[in-house]
Amino acid sequence: MYNAPSAQEMSYSDHVQRRHEEKGCLYACVFTALCCFCCYETCECCLDCLCCCCS
C-alpha cells in the first residue's frame, strides 16, 4: 500500500490532507467520519473536514 514516513510521524491532519489530495474531498470526509465513528468522539480535524466539504 503506502510506505510509512521514514524520518517523522504523519499527524492525523496530515493523513487526512494526504487523502484529500490523492482521492478528493468526499473521500477525505468519509475517511474522517469513519475514523471518528470508530473512536466514538468528534475531533477538531473532523469538524474542519466537514466544513471544507460544505463550502
Swiss-Prot record:
Keywords: Cell membrane, Cell wall, Membrane, Metal-binding, Secreted, Stress response, Transmembrane, Transmembrane helix. Signal peptide: none annotated. InterPro entries: CYSTM1_HM_Tolerance (IPR051671), CYSTM_dom (IPR028144). The keyword Signal does not apply. The chain crosses the membrane at residues 24-40. It is a single-pass membrane protein. The keyword Metal-binding applies. It is found in: Cell membrane; Secreted, Cell wall. Pfam families: CYSTM. GO terms for cellular component: extracellular region; plant-type cell wall; plasma membrane. GO terms for molecular function: metal ion binding; metal ion sequestering activity. GO terms for biological process: cellular detoxification; detoxification of cadmium ion; detoxification of copper ion. Its main location: membrane. Confers resistance to heavy metal ions (e.g. cadmium (CdCl(2)) and copper (CuCl(2))) by chelating them at the plasma membrane of root cells, thus stopping their entry and reducing their accumulation. Belongs to the CYSTM1 family. PANTHER family: CADMIUM TOLERANT 3 (PTHR35470), PROTEIN CYSTEINE-RICH TRANSMEMBRANE MODULE 2 (PTHR35470:SF6). This is Protein CADMIUM TOLERANCE 1. The lineage of its organism: Eukaryota, Viridiplantae, Streptophyta, Embryophyta, Tracheophyta.
